[in-house]
Amino acid sequence: MKALYWLLIGFLSSTLAEVLSSSHPAGVFDAWGIGVIFPLYSLHALVLGGWLFRLGVNWQRLFLFGCVFGMYEAYITKVLWNPYWGPDAFQFLGIYWFQFAVLVFFWHPIFAFILPLLIAEYIYTSSNTLLNAAKQFPLMQKAGKKFALLLAALAGLNQSVNTPPSMFWVALLSFFTILTPSFLLEKRKIEDIMPSGRVLKLLTFALIILYLFWTFALRFDKMGSFSGQLVVWLFYLLLFYLIINIKSCKPESKTSEKKGERRFFAACFLVYLTAFLITSSFKAFPAAMLFLLAGTAYGTIVFASILIKFLMR
């Protein structure tokens, strides 16, 4: 039964990260999606989520593991060293820092890791462990719901810029066709559906093998320079050092009827859908770019606040 939960978490991660950005609008519904994207996102979400619960959940680790997720854009896709989108003016020490900030501090932490796990916790469990951790993010305690509604609206706007309406409706229908029956699954604690023990170690090994394979199989001629690879390794070391040594209050793991959360999730979806429908009829590229820049700025500030507080402890 655990495997079914894992497949659904992988589906959520793949869809939210790749379809919302229109990087791969077909999601997991073609050969590239099912053969490459789905294993890549599933293993990352499960392995990093499993280690998050093994080390102890707090909001800092939740975000930092999301940053680790985003670092696959170095050795697997080589985008941090040789991007095929975005400006190329912010290159230093072999790293394209605009793409680095967008992918490592914003897109992957939020859409590939945190949101999929939050949705999975909401749908498949009776606990609020991750939600309570997410509420501790900067600005979330006082304006969490407003921030989430704004994020939903801007995500819909971003989708309208990058995805034709016909493709959007196909993706949305496919998403709910898979997700709706899963509401009937038995509700457990989030800790119980994440990989642990020997299985977690095996999945970690599988993820390492995946990294080794795609390092050589995908755009190997675009590998970073010595300085670019050194920066990546140093940032990996910094992330893992912070993850292991960071200390903060852990959120309570408690069950809930989730009636309020259910209404709020529905409201977020309606805001997202409305934003898409309104903005798909006109050019909204400047606003979509503002969404990307604002989200990246927020993620960068979150990372900086974690680092500064850790150094000043």
From Swiss-Prot:
Q: How does it sit in the membrane?
A: Multi-pass membrane protein
GO cellular component labels:
plasma membrane
Q: What is its main location?
A: membrane
Residues annotated as transmembrane:
31-53, 62-84, 104-126, 147-161, 166-185, 198-220, 225-244, 264-282, 286-308
> From what superkingdom does this record's organism come?
Archaea
Localization per Swiss-Prot or TrEMBL: Cell membrane
| Keywords carried by this UniProt record | Cell membrane, Membrane, Transmembrane, Transmembrane helix
Record's protein name: Uncharacterized protein AF_0692
Q: What is the lineage of its organism?
A: Archaea, Methanobacteriati, Methanobacteriota, Archaeoglobi, Archaeoglobales
